[in-house]
Amino acid sequence: MDIEGVRMVRDYVQEVTGLELKEEQLEIFSRRLAERISELGFETPFNYYLAVKHRYKDTELVNLIDKMKISETYFFREEDQLVALKEWVIPKIARKAGNGPIRIWSAGCSTGEEAYTLAILCRELKRENPEFAHLRFTIIASDINEIALDSARIGKYSHWAIRHLPPRFVGTYVSTKNGGFEVAQELREMIRFIPVNLNDVASWDERRDFRFDVVFCRNVLMYFSDRRVPEIIRGFHRVLEGDGYLFTASTESLMRHTTIFKPIKMMNTFVYTKRET
């Protein structure tokens, strides 16, 4: 396959979305792209590139983004962070929030495993603590990949995706169905799945509902270039309340990109809070 044509397609998607596909990932992307080009009947990656750029951008870009998806996601990933959220962060916010809802954003939610995990934690906090039984939560889960969002809204998962889900939650928050698992309706009702391009930070300011107490953006920033990451982090700083918290993956340090957040050791993990600027 024409590797230069593949790179042109990759570079175009990167220009529009900010998603960066490393050279070592190009072979996987090339195979997926070849299948798509064959499905549509194009002769070369270059012809496909021209068609996407000038004729089919709105429809075909969705498929291209899906082809670039290489990461894995699953329920209850990095449990130390989840414990810190449930046992420390939410109680601290709740004691200041009064009767207002606690707003959580799962940015780059992919097929929804993280968002549903957050919903389970919120339900469990209310169930276990009478002090917090009155709490209301709003969870926004976003991704640029609309195919992934459609899957998230359906809420059906494989055994592999829920392999870290505590067994006591099976039957309560997920049920077996047709050889897989389906999340409970009460969880789906807690989450709004919406398309958001993290590369287009300016568009966040146009959304009136984009103010959050907690932002989760884990295993996402690694897909953006070093040039784009600081701008995305500044966007998180703007949409977080003054006493809000930002969670990134334990392998993703913000300190090499910016100093507008400060890390706080919390239980067995680190989270970030805003430095006021």
Give, region by region, the residue ranges found by the protein language model.
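Conserved class I S-adenosyl-L-methionine
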Residues: 100-112, 140
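Alpha-helix termini
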Residues: 92-98, 124-132
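Conserved AdoMet
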Residues: 2-105
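Extended basic-aromatic, gly/pro-enriched interface segments that bind polyanionic ligands
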Residues: 107, 128-216, 220-228, 254, ...
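Core SAM-dependent methyltransferase catalytic element
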Residues: 257-277
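A short glycine-rich, Lys/Arg-flanked "PGG" loop and its adjoining helix->strand segment in the class I
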Residues: 230-242
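Conserved beta-strand signature within the Rossmann-like core of class I S-adenosyl-L-methionine
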Residues: 242-250
